[in-house]
């Protein structure tokens, strides 16, 4: 796709939205990041607790877990808070488990010691790709948190073994495109979320045919596109952490 008008956003097929990572966004959490993928904005915080879940007692290793939520008016119409409904949706549970799995893939939990790193991802504005933005921002928040643990002498070394980031790809108008916004996500034939490490290893691939089935050739093209996009996201993570 060379004609940018084929995408509602006017972007090239292989072009990310404008991605911004703002560290130290709030003052209380050990790590706090505002991550923006275009009009999708997520606050990601990392908090350290000197305890572990019951199933890890006496093992000496740590744990990392995540929670995810959306503000009532993060979308076009208001939705009730899940706390008011008294129950999390299946979507919320799925996304927060994904965030936790993604981050644990690049953590040495033994090096973290007997403590828990809580990652909270709160969507303040949604325009597609909230889970991928959450993973990308949560990594930076987690990095800041463990850097403080090392500096304070609470752990001997960083438990982080690699970078991790995530991006969406999809078949839109018969063409593989990168980083779908809401308009594209709502109209695409295939929607795929890809999580990868900085070294290029796959952590998770979630792909669904929303319309027409996709071929192996199309899947390979989508994965290639995702890999290139995640490489750019990792570069942005590094730049943010070095700033």
Curated annotation (Swiss-Prot):
InterPro entries: ExoRNase_PH_dom1, ExoRNase_PH_dom2, ExoRNase_PH_dom2_sf, PNPase/RNase_PH_dom_sf, Ribosomal_Su5_D2-typ_SF, RNase_PH, RNase_PH_bac-type, RNase_PH_CS. The keyword rRNA-binding does not apply. Phosphate binds at residues 91, 129-131. The keyword Transport does not apply. It catalyses: tRNA(n+1) + phosphate = tRNA(n) + a ribonucleoside 5'-diphosphate. Gene3D superfamilies: GHMP Kinase, N-terminal domain. It holds the Pfam family RNase_PH_C. Keywords: Nucleotidyltransferase, RNA-binding, rRNA processing, Transferase, tRNA processing, tRNA-binding. Its EC number is 2.7.7.56. SUPFAM superfamilies: Ribonuclease PH domain 2-like (SSF55666), Ribosomal protein S5 domain 2-like (SSF54211). It comes from the Bacteria. GO terms for molecular function: 3'-5'-RNA exonuclease activity; tRNA binding; tRNA nucleotidyltransferase activity. One of its GO terms (biological process) is rRNA processing. Phosphorolytic 3'-5' exoribonuclease that plays an important role in tRNA 3'-end maturation. Removes nucleotide residues following the 3'-CCA terminus of tRNAs; can also add nucleotides to the ends of RNA molecules by using nucleoside diphosphates as substrates, but this may not be physiologically important. Probably plays a role in initiation of 16S rRNA degradation (leading to ribosome degradation) during starvation. Belongs to the RNase PH family. PANTHER family: EXOSOME COMPLEX COMPONENT, EXOSOME COMPLEX COMPONENT RRP41. Homohexameric ring arranged as a trimer of dimers. This is Ribonuclease PH. It comes from Burkholderia pseudomallei (strain 668).
